[in-house]
């Protein structure tokens, strides 16, 4: 808790300098019962009612802490495009502007695509096959989110 956009860019710079093979970063997940959870509650990043049900089950897409961070929206965009900041020469200059835009479908797609690239490289499998499966999952996930929102509207 307490990460700033400057800290995020410093993490990117360090990863770029180290020439990492797999540029994977994950948002912090403050699991109840841990010291980081207690710190987050005591410092106003989480409320006391926070539970395991509030955590992204994969731990790669969302962090409940992002909402409370001063630079939370910027950090979310940085996290989504982190891979490209490391792997594409000069992209970090564009990224410093992109963090001022709201997160959107394109950033989400690019984030998932970077996860696929890393997954395919790490497991030495065909990227095309991984990509086809990922597109199906992504579209299914969007349909589920739209369905949940529609149900929420009907209940209101």
Give the location of each predicted region.
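A structural motif corresponding to the C-terminal lobe/cap of the Radical SAM core domain
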Residues: 1-100
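Membrane-proximal basic amphipathic "stem/tether" segments
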Residues: 77-156
